């Protein structure tokens, strides 16, 4: 979760911009703001060769993104206890699909450069927008909802994952969602290293995941508005800074959360067509329609 602070701050900003009430369960909201990323931490130890749950996380970023999110919203109409998590999930999806093309293009695909890019952006965003120094502020307590995920959330997530991703979930037990959540908290506690002791003990192996105040001075946020290309459609050129993309995502997420809340509070059972269109079926990774099956390949790495 190298991007965790950014997603939490974005979620908080959506609620503030929209004039929405604060979440009833802030930790659950902030956990929801991490979207499906917690799945990538299942059995994250380098000596454990088991990527079943991680593969589900990858599939959720690339396929049936819209239908899964719409089903989550529909479930939360009746199951009010999961609304904080679902609202956070919405904000995660919108920020990812808006900013990931830029991040992929500037990070490239070698080693852990994607994580390194997101860790750096996390530090810059948290410092500017929330006055938080990520390297000396523990993250795990902000999304620690207890020893296990709430039953209602686990039930819904598991059932919808099996509906939309039958191949990836075939060999995954429901309890492994809780394992992934607990492994995420373990990883965040390991990566929290304000004094550099763990970095020394691991011979620098945690560097791509560790927040630090020290990194090379480069234009990570494209504040110079230099040209960059869409990594999956390289003929499509852009000049937006990260902040421009942030504002675009903020506008879109605020509108979708508003439509979602209106749906939840209405007596209408049918899913609103305006909300369906606003969500679409957009890949978290490419920001394009999932049905196009595009793959990010182009890059001009900043590292």
Residue spans for each PLM region:
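N-terminal leader/auxiliary helical segments
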Residues: 1-86, 93-303
């Amino acid at each position: 979760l190298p991007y965790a602070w950014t997603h939490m701050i974005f979620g908080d900003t959506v609620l503030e911009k929209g004039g929405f009430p604060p979440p009833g369960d802030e930790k659950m909201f902030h956990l929801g703001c991490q979207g499906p990323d917690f799945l990538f931490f299942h059995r994250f130890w380098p000596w454990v060769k088991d990527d079943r749950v991680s593969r589900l996380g990858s599939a959720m970023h690339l396929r049936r993104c819209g239908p899964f999110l719409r089903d989550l919203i529909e479930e939360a109409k009746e199951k009010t206890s999961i609304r904080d998590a679902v609202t956070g999930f919405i904000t995660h999806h919108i920020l990812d699909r808006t900013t990931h093309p830029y991040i992929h293009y500037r990070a490239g695909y070698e080693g852990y450069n994607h994580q390194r890019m997101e860790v750096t952006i996390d530090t810059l965003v948290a410092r500017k927008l929330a006055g938080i120094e990520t390297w000396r502020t523990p993250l795990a307590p902000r999304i620690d909802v207890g020893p296990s995920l709430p039953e209602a959330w686990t039930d819904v997530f598991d059932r919808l994952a099996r509906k939309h991703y039958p191949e990836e979930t075939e060999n995954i037990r429901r309890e492994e969602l809780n394992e992934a959540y607990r492994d995420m908290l373990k990883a965040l506690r390991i990566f929290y290293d304000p004094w550099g002791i763990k970095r020394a003990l691991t011979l620098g192996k945690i560097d791509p995941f560790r927040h630090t105040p020290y990194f090379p001075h480069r234009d990570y946020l494209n504040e110079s508005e230099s040209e960059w290309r869409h990594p999956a459609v390289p003929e499509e050129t852009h000049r937006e800074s990260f902040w421009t993309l942030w504002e675009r995502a903020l506008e879109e997420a605020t509108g979708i959360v508003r439509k979602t809340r209106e749906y939840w509070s209405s007596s209408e059972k049918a899913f609103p067509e305006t909300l369906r269109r606003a969500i679409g079926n957009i890949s978290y990774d490419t920001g394009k329609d999932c049905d196009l099956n595009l793959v990010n390949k182009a890059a001009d790495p900043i590292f």
